[in-house]
């Protein structure tokens, strides 16, 4: 989404077929055991939020930017949320982190330092995305422009552009936090890295292009940071590797050059992700609640099945939301949508399945400004509120009784 302007870790990796099984020893870092996330030797499930705005907001020390970040994290923690997904990029123009290739704003980096530090204080783990597919916050188009090129898809193939991206990855992962004194790659507050928010490619050979890019960049991230988990940033669209699965795509189409199955089978990718936006994906059914409900159930169910049986890695729903800008919106409809997603997550978790949690789009602390994309959620106290639904989900996941942790086989 977004189309708007000290602990030490030891992993025992086993390669079985295409799948890496990670068994985490006692540590502050989250690891993976088969289709489950583990933390300090115990299974962990996630309930959280997106807040792409945190880094740039925290960089604005002249106003109350950092207080806004603190308020959001405090409110999230109060309802039991334990993970946040944020941007670790902003190229080019408004409050840029990366002003030009290799040139960074120290003030904006200090904003990210603060977010990482403050999230740790509230026991909230961070998923940090490293670049945007879209033009907002720069994205791959800005990288291509820096190389003097015109076609955004060259982001995935041009050697100079790929080096720009690798340089950014290294700069972020090896950043020494000015507050904690710890490099990001050594900080257990970070849950995982995300290669790119919602990758897409229109080239006629797009599926091969994206597969090759993910392999290369995932290997590069792991060469720098073996502590943290890694995911791609996929929305979950099926590709041509298993043609019969494309019926689950919105409209049954093959979309965007991504392939949920083959992309997530890359060994250096630790878990799979999906997004869910029935209002925008199914505009003709935007006012037909029953049809949207059917799509949501089928969409999540198909991906859980594939992560359980084919990919054999955890599944995290990293974006879902319902916008007030679509016809027929009401708080009641949004709450029913959230509850539907939460119920599927909980049912999978309770059964020991691969769906490990959900991260809604998006948490904000006020009703004004550029953050108002229609999806914003405010932590209003009281019964029958979205905040109460979130709190209930956090409690249900936290109170699950798990069997003793065993090492899973990928067979």
UniProtKB/Swiss-Prot annotation:
Q: Which residues form the active site?
A: 198, 319
SUPFAM superfamilies with a match to the protein in the record? (Trans)glycosidases (SSF51445)
What GO molecular function annotations does the UniProt record carry, in alphabetical order? mannan endo-1,4-beta-mannosidase activity
Q: Where in the cell is it found?
A: Secreted
Q: Which family does it belong to?
A: Belongs to the glycosyl hydrolase 5 (cellulase A) family.
Q: What EC number(s) is this enzyme filed under?
A: 3.2.1.78
Task: Classify the main location.
Answer: secreted
> Quick one: signal sequence residues?
1-17
- Under which main EC class is this enzyme filed? hydrolase
Which key words tag this protein in UniProt? Glycoprotein, Glycosidase, Hydrolase, Secreted, Signal
Where does this protein come from, organism-wise?
Arabidopsis thaliana (Mouse-ear cress)
GO CC aspect terms: extracellular region
Tissue/organ expression: Expressed in roots, stems and flowers.
What InterPro entries does the record tag this protein with? Answer: Glyco_hydro_5, Glycoside_hydrolase_SF, MAN-like
- One GO biological process term: polysaccharide catabolic process
Which transformation does this protein catalyse, written as a reaction?
A: Random hydrolysis of (1->4)-beta-D-mannosidic linkages in mannans, galactomannans and glucomannans
Q: Which residues are glycosylated?
A: 33, 202, 366, 384
Where, in this chain's numbering, is substrate bound? 87, 197, 277, 361
The protein depicted here goes by the name Mannan endo-1,4-beta-mannosidase 1
């Amino acid at each position: 989404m977004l189309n708007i302007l000290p602990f030490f870790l030891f992993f025992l990796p086993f390669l079985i077929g295409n799948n890496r099984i990670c068994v985490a020893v006692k540590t502050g870092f989250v690891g993976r055991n088969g289709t489950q996330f583990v933390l300090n030797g115990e299974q962990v499930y996630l309930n959280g939020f997106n807040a792409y705005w945190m880094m740039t907001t925290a960089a604005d020390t002249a106003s109350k930017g950092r207080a806004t970040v603190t308020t959001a994290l405090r409110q999230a923690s109060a309802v039991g949320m334990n993970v946040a997904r944020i941007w670790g990029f902003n190229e080019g123009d408004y409050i840029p982190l990366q002003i030009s290739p290799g040139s960074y704003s120290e003030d904006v980096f200090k904003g990210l330092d603060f977010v990482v530090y403050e999230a740790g204080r509230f026991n909230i783990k961070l998923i940090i995305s490293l670049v945007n597919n879209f033009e907002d916050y720069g994205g791959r188009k800005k990288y291509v422009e820096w190389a003097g090129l015109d076609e955004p898809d060259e982001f995935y193939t041009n050697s100079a552009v790929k080096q720009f991206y690798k340089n950014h990855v290294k700069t972020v992962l090896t950043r020494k936090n000015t507050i904690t004194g710890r490099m990001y790659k050594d900080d257990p507050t970070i849950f995982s890295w995300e290669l790119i928010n919602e990758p897409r490619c229109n080239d006629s050979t797009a599926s091969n292009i994206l597969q090759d890019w993910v392999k290369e960049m995932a290997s590069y991230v792991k060469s720098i940071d073996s502590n943290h988990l890694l995911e791609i940033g996929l929305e979950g669209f099926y590709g041509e590797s298993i043609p019969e699965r494309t019926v689950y795509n919105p409209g049954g189409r093959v979309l965007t050059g991504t392939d949920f199955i083959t992309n997530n089978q890359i060994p250096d990718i630790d878990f799979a992700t999906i997004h869910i936006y029935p209002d925008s994906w199914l505009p003709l059914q935007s006012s037909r609640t029953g049809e949207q409900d059917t799509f949501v159930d089928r969409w999540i169910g198909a991906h859980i099945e594939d992560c359980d049986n084919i990919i054999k890695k955890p599944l995290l729903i990293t974006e879902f939301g319902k916008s007030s800008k679509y016809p027929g919106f009401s708080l009641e409809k949004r709450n029913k949508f959230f509850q539907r997603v939460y119920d599927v997550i909980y049912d999978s978790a309770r059964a020991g399945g691969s769906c490990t949690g959900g991260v809604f789009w998006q948490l904000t602390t006020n009703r004004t400004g550029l953050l108002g994309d229609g999806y914003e959620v405010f932590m209003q106290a009281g019964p029958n509120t979205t905040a109460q639904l979130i709190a209930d989900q956090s409690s249900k996941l936290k109170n699950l009784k798990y069997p003793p942790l065993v090492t899973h086989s990928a067979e």
